[in-house]
Regions:
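N-terminal leader/linker segments that initiate helical-solenoid repeat arrays
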Residues: 20-51
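Hydrophobic face of amphipathic alpha-helices that form TPR/SEL1-like repeat modules
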Residues: 30-39, 66-73, 102-109, 140-145
Length: 146
């Protein structure tokens, strides 16, 4: 390993040190910081939902996105497009590409809000710039209808 490689490896280890301390020194238990998981068993759903809401209140864009997905899901008995829209907007403001893609799609289809092709196009272009792969195609589709 050359000098640059050693310096990079040392830098990575120094960055991981606080996470290793939280895991009690067990490198296999490094916590996923600020994440929430809603794909749990039904009996654990309320607890998982509460954890996600707490993370979202703390500004975790991924938690906001996950909550948006949860409330957007057509198979969810708790489906709420207004809640989904709100969480997607919060994550979108932090540059979360998939939240921007979902938000743009909701504006385009008029889900939870009146359809607005101009707003959809702008948000979808932002999503494409931030890395959402399908956003550019959807933005082109919106542009054809403007």
């Amino acid at each position: 390993m050359n000098r640059t490689g050693r310096a990079l490896a040392m830098g990575c280890l120094l960055l991981l040190q606080p996470l290793l301390a939280q895991a009690g020194g067990n490198s296999l238990l490094i916590p996923a910081m600020g994440r929430c998981t809603l794909n749990t068993q039904p009996e654990n759903l309320e607890e998982a939902l509460a954890a996600c809401v707490q993370a979202a209140k703390g500004g975790d864009a991924e938690a906001e996105y996950e909550l948006g997905e949860f409330y957007y899901d057509v198979n969810n008995p708790k489906r709420d497009l207004n809640q989904a829209l709100s969480y997607f907007e919060q994550a979108s403001l932090q540059g979360h590409a998939m939240a921007q893609f979902k938000l743009g799609t909701m504006f385009y289809k008029g889900e939870g809000v009146p359809a607005n092709n101009i707003q959809a196009y702008i948000v979808l272009k932002m999503a494409a710039v931030n890395g959402a792969e399908d956003a550019l195609d959807t933005a082109d589709e919106v542009a054809e209808q403007m």
